[in-house]
């Protein structure tokens, strides 16, 4: 997850933003969570491909401080997370709002990870566009 395309640092607050928009299903997104070595605000959700989210949520394993959800799947994922005892959940209308909420909630040393476990359709043309918009929103904070 490290590289110029994947990582943006907020020098004012000491927060690192990671673009793993390619994590378009729970299995791929688990790898993004596992790569985190700091408290993480996770942006997830998107188009519903009828995936199950239990294993993805189990991968939080104390790493995820907040789950910030967008898209068609936000309520479905919220219910699954709550079933697993995870309640630090924020529902947002879109990715722009999610990035802003993460910026407000993040503490020095935290990471913000876009690893949505869902497809981008319905909000974006593809995962590349979603990732590009994420980077733009972060730069404009």
Where are these regions (language model features)?
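Short beta-strands and strand-loop turn motifs
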Residues: 113-117
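C-terminal helical cap/extension that packs against the catalytic core
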Residues: 54-110
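A short acidic, helix-capping loop that chelates divalent metal ions and anchors anionic groups
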Residues: 15-16, 120-123
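Nucleotide phosphate-binding/pyrophosphate-handling subdomain across enzymes
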Residues: 4-64
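Phosphate-binding loop of NTP-binding sites
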Residues: 122, 135-141
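Phosphate- and divalent-cation-binding pockets in alpha/beta enzyme and binding domains
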Residues: 28, 76-79, 123
């Amino acid at each position: 997850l490290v590289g110029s395309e994947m990582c943006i640092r907020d020098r004012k607050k000491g927060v690192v933003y990671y673009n793993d928009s390619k994590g378009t299903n729970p299995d791929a997104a688990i790898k993004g969570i596992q790569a985190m070595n700091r408290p993480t605000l996770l942006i997830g959700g998107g188009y519903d491909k009828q995936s199950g989210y239990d294993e993805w949520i189990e991968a939080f394993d104390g790493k995820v401080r907040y789950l910030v959800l967008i898209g068609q799947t936000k309520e479905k994922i919220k219910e699954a997370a709550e079933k697993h005892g995870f309640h630090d959940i924020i529902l947002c209308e879109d990715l722009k709002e999610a990035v802003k909420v993460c910026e407000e909630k993040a503490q020095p040393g935290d990471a913000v990870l876009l690893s949505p476990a869902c497809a981008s359709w319905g909000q974006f043309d593809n995962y590349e566009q979603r990732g590009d918009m994420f980077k733009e929103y972060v730069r404009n904070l």
